From Swiss-Prot:
The keyword Transferase does not apply. The lineage of its organism: Eukaryota, Metazoa, Chordata, Craniata, Vertebrata. Ca(2+) binds at residues 55, 57, 59, 76. It comes from Bungarus candidus (Malayan krait). This is Acidic phospholipase A2 1. Transmembrane segments: none annotated.
Length: 152
């Protein structure tokens, strides 16, 4: 086998093995993370908000540990509302699968008028949370907490 082909094949295999450990993310998650990046600008990224407090990332139970965690709780509740929304009830229009459009300019997020009813609802959920994140202080001690003890 040509060494160049072997190197390409090996690189693809290593990439696939690494990607196998990454859980699939809902389509709207990408829009949400882009919105967060639009509003927070600076050293924090959306990854800093994963596994934060009782509501940011996986979890969603108990009493929020701070203002930022309340932003995530509000976002979770908004998505729960969206799941009950008549225009978001099908698999294709699920809050987690529906893509919407928006613009970001100077930290200002605008949900586009061409979104369907479900997309507009989800866009507003994500927009509200991203703006909330921009105002809430980030407390390093609330990252990767023991949710079994602190989120009752």
């Amino acid at each position: 086998m040509n060494p160049a082909y072997f190197l390409v094949l090996a690189a693809v295999c290593v990439s696939l093995l690494g990607a196998a450990n990454i859980p699939p993310q809902p389509l709207s998650f990408y829009r949400y993370t882009e919105m967060i990046q639009c509003t927070i600008r600076g050293s924090l990224t959306y990854l800093d908000y994963m596994d934060y407090g009782c509501y940011c990332g996986t979890g969603s139970r108990g009493t929020p540990v701070d203002e930022l965690d309340r932003c995530c709780q509000t976002h979770d509740n908004c998505y729960a509302e969206a799941e009950e929304h008549p225009k978001c009830s099908s698999l294709v229009k699920s809050p987690y699968m529906n893509l919407y459009s928006y613009t970001c300019s100077g930290g200002t997020i605008t949900c586009n008028a061409d979104n369907d009813e479900c997309g507009a609802f989800i866009c507003n959920c994500d927009r509200t949370a991203a703006l909330c994140f921009a105002k809430a202080p980030y407390n390093e001690e609330n990252k990767e907490i023991d949710i079994s003890k602190r989120c009752q």
